[in-house]
């Protein structure tokens, strides 16, 4: 029997049950026991659903209450001292992630950053020279017992020790976290021994760092690690998000029992690696895309897999390319999608069914079944809705001048100072304000047809008026309309641009209880009508202060959507860039003097290997500049980025040529600014001065210290003051309190820094 397995399954539930259970517990409305019961129910449901769909080896240990890296930190007892309070439990985990929990003292949350090149996030492990590890939280072992009690075929899932250390950060200078490997391996040996004692045969040990360009000392660390971990259980070395062919010499020397390859992200590595695999190894072929919603063309996969089956026999497994965490749960809930469009898609459960089909086929099943399943994708190739001549013609007619502003930044900066007359250290926010229950109910009533368009418009205008009044009372210098009309910064534009499909239950986890519902790019993209103009004009009519027009940039819309698989990402980005360009021109024509084009995802789109970086950055920068360039010098273009390590992309960030960039820096204590200082970044910067992901309200002294730190690296006349990110997920009480502190801190420092 050909083993069919997934690397992980979405935790949140088809209707976001985990999200609502977490938030209820955090609000004190339910008990920890009730939350734990919800998690157990979801795990059982998901295991059984995968089994029914055709998966015959189930992932156990992929469930996480916040993220799997944080879960690993608790497993090996790598909990920062400030978050400890009695025994390690769920509240310990939430204190690390959120800065506070229903029990225990509040403390600064751990730093959060992107999981490789995805829109998923993890809490960065913190390491010190005297770090000690021990067997800690028992969640993994408890879940193995749960699955075995149900009689299910178990494959334990464990983040590998080298990748775990790689994903962390030293909290003191003078040592490398790699020095901690030997101590960590002792605990990993205990983990594997305990899993073996529970009757676990296979452990999926994830080492995604192998897809990166690793320093030699980190590459060699794998040899030491897997020499010591060999024995108790069979180890499936699991890689994803890119090719690991460049690590062939290391990988084929490791004492493991199999290798998983992401053959969606890097199909070419199959020919490079398979001939060199040890004769006894399993090959797990990751052929079903775990990061997209498109139905797999199984008929195209069949010949390659059949040849592998003939060569490897039972040593060939079929799998998702990566965890299905990055895919929505169940397509059968999407009753409102056009049936033809729906026939192009497969969500997590349907991908399990695809694996089952492949497994059956490889074990002698009928090719006709595979061919029939793939037919909707064949039909799509000739669908007239997919390729639009007008869009293609406009792209073909672009010239170099379409990607450039009228003048260089120094000329623009003077024109903007003369026009805007802002004070030193201008204060602003990133864009969104709290999405209250009142706003959500208003949107739900409108979508359900229980209120008409005029009532909805009046309701949103009331929210905008409230946001403007609150900002003026706080004393902010540059205002925003608050985005009450937007359920999501990408989905909103996906609904209004032609070329996207919007799902109802296509939710995926971003971090913790935060879920996003990416639109799906299905055809060529264009803008039938203005998308933000009327709301922004209304907001500006209420105040004499400048109101920023708020747009999401083309690279972020692309990265935070499920992309097409039949055209390049560059092609889609430029199509979106043209649509945003038209919106920018309309906003400027309406008198909006500051326009923000958010690109928080530009770093996450970066390929994992340096050799591929420049090609991506070239088209990403061009797409942004295409969207931002149709304005006069006195119109100020802002952009926002978050969770970014800017060292790799600082030249590209400068090449965007935005007049002002706001970035997320408070959790890293302004360390991210070092890249801008070393590069001598020429334009204006707004480093975030407080962490919006934590509900804690910062002190004025804390913010003043961060502004002073920033002013040592960026001249004060090019410095803005703002929160780290948008405030959509916060409540108004904490939002107003934090912004008042921020404004007061700024006013206190203006004379000092003048």
Curated annotation (Swiss-Prot):
The catalytic site is made up of 693 (proton donor)
Binding positions for 5-methyltetrahydropteroyltri-L-glutamate per the UniProt entry? 16-19, 114, 514-515, 560, 604
* Cofactor info, note text: Binds 1 zinc ion per subunit.
The Swiss-Prot or TrEMBL record lists the needed cofactor(s) as:
Zn(2+)
Describe its function: Catalyzes the transfer of a methyl group from 5-methyltetrahydrofolate to homocysteine resulting in methionine formation.
> Which PANTHER family does the UniProt entry name for this protein?
5-METHYLTETRAHYDROPTEROYLTRIGLUTAMATE--HOMOCYSTEINE METHYLTRANSFERASE
HAMAP family tied to this protein: Meth_synth (MF_00172)
Write down what this protein is called: 5-methyltetrahydropteroyltriglutamate--homocysteine methyltransferase
- The protein's organism comes out as Aeromonas salmonicida (strain A449)
């Amino acid at each position: 029997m050909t083993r069919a397995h997934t690397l992980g399954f979405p935790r949140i539930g088809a209707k976001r049950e985990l999200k609502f259970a977490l938030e209820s517990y955090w609000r004190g409305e339910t008990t920890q026991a009730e939350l734990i019961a919800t998690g157990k129910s979801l795990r059982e449901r998901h295991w059984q659903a995968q089994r029914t769909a055709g998966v015959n080896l189930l992932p156990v240990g992929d469930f996480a209450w916040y993220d799997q890296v944080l879960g690993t930190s608790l497993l090996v007892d790598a909990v920062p001292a400030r978050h400890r309070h009695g025994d390690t439990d769920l509240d310990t985990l939430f204190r690390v992630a959120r800065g506070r929990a229903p029990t225990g003292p509040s403390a600064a949350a751990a730093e959060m950053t992107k999981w490789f090149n995805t829109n998923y996030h993890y809490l960065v492990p913190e390491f010190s020279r005297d770090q000690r590890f021990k067997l800690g939280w028992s969640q993994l072992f408890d879940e193995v017992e749960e699955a075995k009690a149900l009689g299910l075929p178990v494959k334990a899932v464990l983040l590998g020790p080298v990748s775990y250390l790689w994903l962390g950060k030293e909290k003191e200078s003078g040592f490398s976290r790699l020095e901690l490997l030997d101590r960590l391996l002792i605990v990993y040996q205990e983990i594997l021994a305990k899993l073996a004692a529970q009757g676990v045969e296979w452990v999926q040990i994830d080492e995604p760092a192998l897809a990166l360009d690793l320093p030699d000392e980190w590459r060699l660390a794998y040899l030491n690690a897997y020499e010591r971990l060999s024995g108790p259980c069979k180890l499936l070395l699991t890689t994803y998000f890119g090719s690991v062919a460049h690590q062939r010499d290391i990988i084929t020397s490791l004492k493991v029992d199999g290798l998983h390859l992401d053959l969606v992200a890097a199909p070419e590595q199959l020919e490079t690696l398979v001939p060199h695999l040890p004769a006894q190894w399993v090959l797990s072929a990751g052929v079903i895309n775990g990061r997209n919603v498109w139905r797999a063309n199984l008929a195209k996969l069949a010949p390659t897999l059949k040849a592998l089956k003939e060569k490897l026999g039972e040593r060939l497994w079929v799998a998702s390319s990566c965890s299905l965490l990055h895919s929505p749960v169940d397509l059968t809930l999407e009753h409102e999608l056009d049936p033809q469009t729906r026939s192009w898609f497969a969500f997590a459960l349907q991908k399990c069914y695809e694996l089952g089909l492949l497994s059956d086929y490889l074990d002698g099943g009928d090719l006709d079944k595979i061919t029939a399943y793939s037919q909707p994708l064949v039909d799509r190739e000739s669908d007239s809705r997919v390729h639009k001549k007008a869009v293609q013609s406009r792209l073909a007619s672009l010239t170099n001048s379409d990607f450039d502003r009228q003048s260089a930044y120094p000329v623009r900066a003077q024109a903007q100072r003369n026009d805007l007359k802002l004070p030193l250290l201008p204060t602003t926010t990133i864009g969104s304000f709290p999405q209250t229950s009142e706003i959500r109910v208003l949107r739900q009533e409108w979508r359900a047809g229980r209120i008409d368009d005029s009532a909805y418009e009046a309701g949103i205008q009331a929210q905008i008026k409230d946001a403007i009044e609150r900002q003026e009372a706080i004393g902010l210098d540059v205002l925003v309309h608050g985005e009450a009309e937007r359920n999501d910064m990408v989905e909103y534009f996906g609904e209004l641009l032609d070329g996207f499909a919007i799902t109802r239950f296509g939710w995926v986890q971003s971090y913790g209880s935060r879920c996003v519902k990416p639109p799906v790019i299905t055809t060529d993209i264009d803008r039938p009508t203005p998308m933000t103009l009327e709301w922004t004009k209304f907001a500006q009519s209420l105040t004499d202060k400048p109101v920023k027009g708020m747009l999401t940039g083309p690279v972020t819309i692309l990265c935070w959507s499920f992309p097409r698989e039949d055209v390049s990402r560059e092609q889609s980005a430029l199509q979106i860039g043209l649509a945003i360009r038209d919106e920018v021109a309309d906003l400027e024509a309406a008198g909006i003097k500051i326009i923000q084009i958010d690109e928080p995802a530009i770093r996450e789109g970066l390929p994992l290997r340096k050799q591929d970086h420049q090609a991506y950055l070239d088209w990403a920068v061009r797409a942004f500049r295409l969207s931002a360039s149709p304005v006069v010098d006195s119109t100020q273009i802002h952009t926002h980025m978050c969770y970014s390590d800017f060292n790799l992309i600082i030249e590209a960030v400068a090449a965007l040529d935005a007049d002002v960039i706001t970035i997320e820096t408070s959790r890293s204590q302004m360390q991210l600014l070092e890249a801008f200082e070393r590069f001598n970044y020429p334009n204006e910067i707004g480093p975030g001065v407080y962490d919006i992901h934590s509900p804690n309200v910062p002190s004025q002294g804390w913010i003043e210290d961060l502004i002073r730190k920033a002013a040592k690296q960026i001249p004060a006349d090019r410095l803005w003051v703002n929160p780290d990110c948008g405030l959509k997920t916060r409540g108004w009480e904490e939002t107003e309190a934090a912004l008042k502190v921020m404004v007061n801190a700024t006013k206190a420092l203006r004379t000092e820094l003048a």
